[in-house]
């Protein structure tokens, strides 16, 4: 769990510092449109759309942008995006999972493969690394939601599996199938969550040194910079000393 938390935290901080808002909003809008197109355009009747909108709001995406993304799906003029997952190994044999929404599988696959190759890694077949991850729900709250004891008690009552609290906030994990029920129960006690999403949580982590960590961060940065890529997950773990250097 420590490795996953470290990875989450470093990506969280780096994302805050480096993210280009227009690109981030574009990716959030794409998820909203795909979610709205996959079911009812009403978030009350479409759990995926409700989560997509909630996460967009957490990133301060303007209300007009959110409504436009929903209407785009309802209007029938939205591009046909496919959900694809790529799996491979980065520097040091670290497992990497890439989730994308694309209207051109060949383009996206070529771009992702090229990034892995340039980083000294290799793209594998679907399933080549995901067996070493668990698909779980992740619900995050800011520290203002309450102290660690209050959040822990709420998480236990809601049926969550794990809770961690650090300087970035509270992170609650639950079973993939229970995301909706757990997040709803938590909302009744703690208020609206900062984010609610499904993630790939590594079963075990791989320790890496500073050089490998820098290479991995560069690979992940490049992947996240691709317009089609929505999420990137990995299983590397770094020491507190290296973490401090990379976060500086």
Curated annotation (Swiss-Prot):
Presence of the UniProt keyword Endoplasmic reticulum in the record: no
Listed Pfam families: TACO1_YebC_N, Transcrip_reg
Any single biological process term in GO: regulation of DNA-templated transcription
Coiled-coil regions listed: none
GO CC annotations, alphabetized: cytosol
Keywords on record: Cytoplasm, DNA-binding, Transcription, Transcription regulation
Classification via Gene3D superfamilies: 1.10.10.200, 3.30.70.980
Any one GO molecular function term: DNA binding
Subcellular location: Cytoplasm
PANTHER family, per database record: TRANSCRIPTIONAL REGULATORY PROTEIN YEBC-RELATED, TRANSLATIONAL ACTIVATOR OF CYTOCHROME C OXIDASE 1
Protein family according to the UniProt entry: Belongs to the TACO1 family.
Name of this protein: Probable transcriptional regulatory protein NGR_c27950
């Amino acid at each position: 769990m420590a490795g996953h938390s470290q990875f989450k935290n470093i990506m969280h901080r780096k994302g805050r510092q480096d993210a280009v808002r227009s690109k981030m909003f574009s990716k959030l809008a794409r998820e909203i449109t795909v979610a709205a197109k996959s079911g009812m355009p009403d978030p009350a009747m479409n759990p995926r759309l409700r989560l997509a909108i909630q996460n967009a709001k957490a990133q301060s995406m303007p209300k007009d942008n959110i409504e436009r993304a929903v209407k785009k799906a309802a209007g029938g003029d939205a591009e046909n995006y496919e959900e694809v997952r790529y799996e491979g190994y980065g520097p040091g044999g670290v497992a990497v999972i890439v989730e994308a929404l694309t209207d051109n599988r060949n383009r996206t696959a070529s771009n992702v493969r090229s990034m892995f190759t340039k980083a000294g890694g290799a793209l594998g077949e679907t399933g080549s690394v995901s067996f070493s991850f668990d698909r779980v729900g992740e619900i995050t709250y800011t520290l203002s939601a309450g102290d660690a004891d209050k959040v822990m008690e709420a998480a236990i009552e809601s049926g969550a599996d794990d809770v961690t609290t650090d300087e970035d906030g509270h992170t609650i994990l639950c079973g993939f199938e229970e995301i909706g029920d757990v997040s709803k129960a938590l909302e009744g006690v703690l208020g609206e969550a900062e984010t609610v999403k499904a993630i790939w949580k590594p079963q075990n982590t791989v320790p890496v040194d500073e050089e490998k960590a820098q290479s991995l961060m560069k690979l992940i940065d490049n992947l996240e910079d691709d317009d089609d890529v929505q999420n990137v997950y990995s299983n590397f773990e770094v020491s507190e000393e290296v973490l401090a250097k990379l976060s500086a």
